[in-house]
């Protein structure tokens, strides 16, 4: 009897080293894509540019711009509206960031859910 348990399955063509090398290449490609996404910034804008929120490609909030003169803070409703606009602008920017991430990670994202260090949405 042979020492190779895979010979019974057709000649023992299973190459663990090749599989590990492929996994390492995929990990490097994923890391590179995530680095590019971290450096990419998208804007979410509402109310004709009254509020603009900047989010990087991994969904991190990196800036908020409020157009001068739009809100003086004297009316409590203005402040409430401002909060709502910031949230809406963030959602817009985050949707764009998610779309970018989907494009950038594409085939690399397949099967990555549940891997250590990549929970749920690849850590985003």
Swiss-Prot record:
The keyword Cytoplasm applies. It comes from the Bacteria. Keywords: Cytoplasm, DNA-binding. Disulfide bonds: none annotated. GO terms for cellular component: bacterial nucleoid; cytosol. Its main location: cytoplasm. It is found in: Cytoplasm, Nucleoid. The keyword RNA-binding does not apply. One of its GO terms (molecular function) is DNA binding. Homodimer. NCBIfam families: DNA_YbaB_EbfC (TIGR00103). Belongs to the YbaB/EbfC family. Binds to DNA and alters its conformation. May be involved in regulation of gene expression, nucleoid organization and DNA protection. This is Nucleoid-associated protein Noca_0318. It comes from Nocardioides sp. (strain ATCC BAA-499 / JS614).
